[in-house]
Amino acid sequence: MTIFNGLSESGESKKLNSKIEKQIENASKKDKKIYKVLLLGASDSGKSTISKQIKILNKNGFSQEEIMTFIPVIRRNLLESAKTLVKIIVQKGINLDPLGTHNCEIIEKFNPTPGELINANIGQAITSLWSANSVRSCTYGNDSVLIDSAPYFFSRADEICSRHYVPTIDDILRSRNSTLGISEISFTLDHLQIRMFDVGGQRTERRKWIYCFENVNSIIFCVSLNDYDKKLYERAAPERNRLVESISLFDSIINSQWFMHSSIILFLNKFDLFRKKLEHVPFQDYFPQYEGKNSVKSITRYILWLFVNPSINRAKHNIYPHITTAVDTSNIKVVFSAVKETILQHSLKEAGMF
């Protein structure tokens, strides 16, 4: 029987520190000819989704056992998002019919303990509530703190809450579980051994470990285009715009002494969500200095310029940008064909053969 298992993202800091330091020490002892890639980006930029896509494209995907481990993660994403949705409805004073009000009550009162079965009633309540146009429209704007995949999970609430639920690949790609510390995936590109490290995106994570990767060959930096109207989740800077935070992080990375010789690959990610949001949320409301056309192409170019202009790229790196939708496997397959060429050329250059 499948269960709803609330996963804790907290832990003992000292144990986590020790574990990560041991990972780094072990990594340095391995073959130095291995090409190392560091996957970076602010929280919720899509880094972990990129890691999953690499596993799908280069590691034969997920085993059945691995697929089943995503059930509690996805159910937690769904339930937490549904509770957040109810809070938004209350805060905005959205008028609901009696059924909508009843559904909100069901969602608010549902607080499963670890080991408790999730039931079909909660799935039906979420599906019914999300079907109301007034509810859907109230989520637009920067005051919405829903995760990007919330609408997708709401549309699949009945399936996710089913006793016999088995996650699809799309479910897995859209699941969100904050990266704590470092995760690693190894794969091969044209006989070149790649080790990719995904470092936690939260401020407290990246500050601790970034200096440990001074010999990294390439950096893939992920940016969520969809974050132009959002504020940070983190307590240290709760009012800071998340796109501005990404620019600041990118600045600190590419101009760091540790990465002067690394190739820089920039993923402008979540393009699908960004394009839809621009129809409802004007970019200039959050970046009034932008004076261009209100078009997806013009605004995308402007955001790219914010990252690659000389005041940011003071180290004068060659930056290789790509527009990505991390949940779209076909898109990532095309993008990684180009990334592969960048990595191979850089490896040849390092070997003095290019």
From Swiss-Prot:
<dbReference type="GO" id="GO:0000122">
    <property type="term" value="P:negative regulation of transcription by RNA polymerase II"/>
</dbReference>
<comment type="subunit">
    <text>G proteins are composed of 3 units; alpha, beta and gamma. Binding of the beta-gamma subunit complex (git5-git11) to the alpha subunit (gpa2) facilitates interaction with GPCR git3. Interacts with GPCR git3; the interaction is direct and leads to activation of gpa2 upon glucose stimulation. Interacts with adenylate cyclase cyr1 (via N-terminus); the interaction is direct and serves to activate adenylate cyclase and cAMP-PKA signaling, to repress sexual development and gluconeogenesis.</text>
</comment>
<feature type="binding site">
    <location>
        <position position="49"/>
    </location>
    <ligand>
        <name>GTP</name>
    </ligand>
</feature>
<keyword id="KW-0460">Magnesium</keyword>
<keyword id="KW-0807">Transducer</keyword>
<feature type="binding site">
    <location>
        <position position="326"/>
    </location>
    <ligand>
        <name>GTP</name>
    </ligand>
</feature>
<dbReference type="GO" id="GO:0005829">
    <property type="term" value="C:cytosol"/>
</dbReference>
<dbReference type="Pfam" id="PF00503">
    <property type="entry name" value="G-alpha"/>
</dbReference>
<dbReference type="GO" id="GO:0007189">
    <property type="term" value="P:adenylate cyclase-activating G protein-coupled receptor signaling pathway"/>
</dbReference>
<feature type="binding site">
    <location>
        <position position="45"/>
    </location>
    <ligand>
        <name>GTP</name>
    </ligand>
</feature>
<keyword id="KW-0378">Hydrolase</keyword>
<dbReference type="GO" id="GO:0003924">
    <property type="term" value="F:GTPase activity"/>
</dbReference>
<dbReference type="GO" id="GO:0046872">
    <property type="term" value="F:metal ion binding"/>
</dbReference>
<dbReference type="GO" id="GO:0010856">
    <property type="term" value="F:adenylate cyclase activator activity"/>
</dbReference>
<feature type="region of interest" description="G4 motif">
    <location>
        <begin position="265"/>
        <end position="272"/>
    </location>
</feature>
<feature type="region of interest" description="G1 motif">
    <location>
        <begin position="36"/>
        <end position="49"/>
    </location>
</feature>
<feature type="binding site">
    <location>
        <position position="44"/>
    </location>
    <ligand>
        <name>GTP</name>
    </ligand>
</feature>
<feature type="binding site">
    <location>
        <position position="179"/>
    </location>
    <ligand>
        <name>Mg(2+)</name>
    </ligand>
</feature>
<dbReference type="GO" id="GO:0010515">
    <property type="term" value="P:negative regulation of induction of conjugation with cellular fusion"/>
</dbReference>
<feature type="binding site">
    <location>
        <position position="46"/>
    </location>
    <ligand>
        <name>GTP</name>
    </ligand>
</feature>
<feature type="binding site">
    <location>
        <position position="201"/>
    </location>
    <ligand>
        <name>GTP</name>
    </ligand>
</feature>
<comment type="function">
    <text>Alpha subunit of the heterotrimeric guanine nucleotide-binding protein (G protein) involved in glucose-induced cAMP signaling. Binds to its cognate transmembrane receptor git3, which senses extracellular glucose, and activates cAMP-PKA signaling to repress sexual development and gluconeogenesis.</text>
</comment>
<feature type="binding site">
    <location>
        <position position="173"/>
    </location>
    <ligand>
        <name>GTP</name>
    </ligand>
</feature>
<comment type="similarity">
    <text>Belongs to the G-alpha family.</text>
</comment>
<dbReference type="GO" id="GO:0005737">
    <property type="term" value="C:cytoplasm"/>
</dbReference>
<dbReference type="GO" id="GO:0044732">
    <property type="term" value="C:mitotic spindle pole body"/>
</dbReference>
<feature type="binding site">
    <location>
        <position position="47"/>
    </location>
    <ligand>
        <name>GTP</name>
    </ligand>
</feature>
<feature type="binding site">
    <location>
        <position position="179"/>
    </location>
    <ligand>
        <name>GTP</name>
    </ligand>
</feature>
<dbReference type="GO" id="GO:0001664">
    <property type="term" value="F:G protein-coupled receptor binding"/>
</dbReference>
<feature type="region of interest" description="G3 motif">
    <location>
        <begin position="194"/>
        <end position="203"/>
    </location>
</feature>
<dbReference type="GO" id="GO:0032153">
    <property type="term" value="C:cell division site"/>
</dbReference>
<dbReference type="GO" id="GO:0005525">
    <property type="term" value="F:GTP binding"/>
</dbReference>
<feature type="domain" description="G-alpha">
    <location>
        <begin position="33"/>
        <end position="354"/>
    </location>
</feature>
<dbReference type="InterPro" id="IPR027417">
    <property type="entry name" value="P-loop_NTPase"/>
</dbReference>
<dbReference type="GO" id="GO:0005834">
    <property type="term" value="C:heterotrimeric G-protein complex"/>
</dbReference>
<feature type="binding site">
    <location>
        <position position="272"/>
    </location>
    <ligand>
        <name>GTP</name>
    </ligand>
</feature>
<dbReference type="InterPro" id="IPR001019">
    <property type="entry name" value="Gprotein_alpha_su"/>
</dbReference>
<dbReference type="GO" id="GO:0031683">
    <property type="term" value="F:G-protein beta/gamma-subunit complex binding"/>
</dbReference>
<feature type="region of interest" description="G5 motif">
    <location>
        <begin position="324"/>
        <end position="329"/>
    </location>
</feature>
<keyword id="KW-0547">Nucleotide-binding</keyword>
<keyword id="KW-0479">Metal-binding</keyword>
<feature type="region of interest" description="G2 motif">
    <location>
        <begin position="171"/>
        <end position="179"/>
    </location>
</feature>
